[in-house]
Amino acid sequence: MPSLKSFSAAEEEDDQLGRNSEAERFNPEAVEKEEDPDKMDEKDESGDEEDDVKRDQVEAEDEEALGEEEDSKERSQSSSAGELSESEYMVVDLADICKDVQCSICLGIIRKTRTVMECLHRFCRECIDKSMRLGNNECPTCRKHCASRRSLRDDPNFDALIAALFKNIDKFEEEELNFRQDDEARNKQIQASIAQVSQRQSKALVKRKSVGKGTAILSRSRRSGGGSRRRRNCRNIEQDTSEANDDDDQNKRGKDSSSDEPCERQRKKRSATQPSSSNANNNDNCAGNGTEQTHQRDSRVISPVLVWNSELIAWGRGGTRSNTRQGNNNQGAISKRNARLKRLVEYLGSLEGNSVELDIHLKLVSLDTEGLLNLHEPYLCFRPTLLVKQLREYVARHLKLKAEEVELLVSKDGDTVIGNKTSTEKMQSLQDDETVAKLKVDCISSNGYMIVVYRRKQIA
């Protein structure tokens, strides 16, 4: 067996040598490489250097990647911690929490909290103790029965929460009070402005209504005037056409001798209708009697010229058709009279709202105690707003005296006292700031005017 192994090893060495020789034949470069060992060493050294540089680059890249991974881990940890912190805390408005931490007895923030064990409602210690001492053995919020003050328990956790939310309770309550007062003042101002606007609107509406009534009256008067003119013109035209038709009919009837009897009958009928229309017009006292008579005489004859007038042809309005159909010749005059009365009533009603100031008539009489002459024009007419001072100046100017030297008197008994010029006991002196309207009712005489007496003022 060992001899076989050695033989196989020798054969393998020969095979390798043969292969190397064949490779040298077909690869002359390899032979040259083997022949230059210095070059081979230089190449090996340069390759080692390149490998070292590559290794350094790979290590640097690995270190950078590790650093980035660590940074990302730190960032993720910090972000997760921030999210946890944000989830733990939330922003709260104190105005929204006030209702939850408010005592229902004093309506302020709870101080030294005490909780009712039966219903878990919280109150201030002083408030609930005082309520219990007064005999209210029940919860002030839900009215649940409480046996005694033993059912009350302190709540330090709630006190700690209030202390964390409201660091200065007194200051917070003061700010809330000021805010409420400002809000109330603002609401009052808004209400006052709304009231002023409503008053202005109501005044504007009243003015519009008054102006509208005045314009309506003017427009009605103009329309009525225009309508009356149109009616007169139409009646004149109709009268002319009816007279022409009558002349033609008479000529035709004169030619036909056989139709004498019906003509006489028609004339009798027309003459019979004339006095009734004239009597009705006289009773109504209308201005256009002549034109209405002619219109009622020939009401049976309708000319084609009047077709455009809607007032004469309208049914039931006192026009020609209604007169001919119903046989009532006075209906047009009655409707006109009613229209005039209606306009007069509307005009008088519109005058009721206007404050019309009427003039006051007075007579100036002199007592002639010191030889003062009477005025040339003693009867005067003044407005009610005239002052006594102005009247005194008027008298003094005509008497050529100063206004301070003239004294005006008035008597409430009328002409009886003034007849005795020397007696001034029942007369009353007038002040400068008085108006004539104040003296109108008390001092009117039987003649319908006011009597004022003047004299020279007696200076002590």
From Swiss-Prot:
Q: Tell me the protein's name.
A: Putative E3 ubiquitin-protein ligase RING1b
The UniProt entry's GO CC annotations, sorted and at most eight, read: PRC1 complex
Know anything about its domains from the record? The RING-type zinc finger domain mediates binding to an E2 ubiquitin-conjugating enzyme.
Q: What happens when the gene is disrupted?
A: Normal phenotype. Drastic growth defects like ectopic meristem formation and sterility when associated with the disruption of RING1A.
**Species per Swiss-Prot/TrEMBL record:** Arabidopsis thaliana
CDD domains on file: RING-HC_RING1-like
PANTHER family on file: E3 UBIQUITIN-PROTEIN LIGASE RING1B-RELATED (PTHR46537:SF1), OS11G0578200 PROTEIN (PTHR46537)
User: Where is the signal peptide, in residue numbers?
Assistant: none
Stretches of Low complexity bias are at: 276-290
